[in-house]
Structure formats: C-alpha cells, structure tokens
Amino acid sequence: MTAKAQVKLYTRPGCHLCEEAKREILAANCSQDYVLEEINVETDPALVEHYGWEIPVIIINGIKAFKYRVTAAEFRSKLKRLSRS
C-alpha cells in the first residue's frame, strides 16, 4: 500500500483565493490519495513573515506545487507526479 501524499494548504481568513483553492482540491475527487492540512498563516508570526499576502500556497510532499490559483485537473496531475516514489 502506497502512503498518502501530504498536502498543506496555507490560507488566511477572508481569503477568497484560498477558498477557491480548497474547493478545487476537493473537486479533484482524489481525497483517498492525500491527507490535507489547512494552515492559517495568521496563527504563526513566522508564517506571516514567510508568506505575507502571497497565499494560498499548496505544498505537496514538501514541494511548493501552487501559489494563488489551481484547478482540479492541475491538482490531480501534480499530486500524481509528486506522489511517485
């Protein structure tokens, strides 16, 4: 059995692009292949310093995969590519 990919979605409250990104991730219909962790950058000053307003950011298995916008098809494709061992 292959381990699930680790997906981190860096967001902040009131961010409409963040909401869109999460919708697209969920619309990709491949949730069986990953574990999603949504992280509010405002909870950690270091994250605010690092990301500022440049969110959403999607990290797959430790690799920055997307910034700002993503489609369900793009997410599925990159998840598959970055999940290969």
Predicted stretch roles:
Residues 63-85:
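Non-catalytic, surface beta->alpha helical segment in thiol-disulfide oxidoreductase systems
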Residues 56-64:
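A short, hydrophobic beta-strand/beta-hairpin element that forms part of a small beta-sheet core
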Residues 34-45:
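Thiol-based oxidoreductase modules, predominantly thioredoxin-like and allied folds used
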Residues 2-27:
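Local sequence-structure signature of Cys/Sec-based thiol-disulfide redox active-site neighborhoods
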Residues 23-35, 52:
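Conserved segment of the thioredoxin-like fold in thiol-based oxidoreductases
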Residues 20-23, 50-53, 70:
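Generic recognition of short, well-ordered alpha-helical segments
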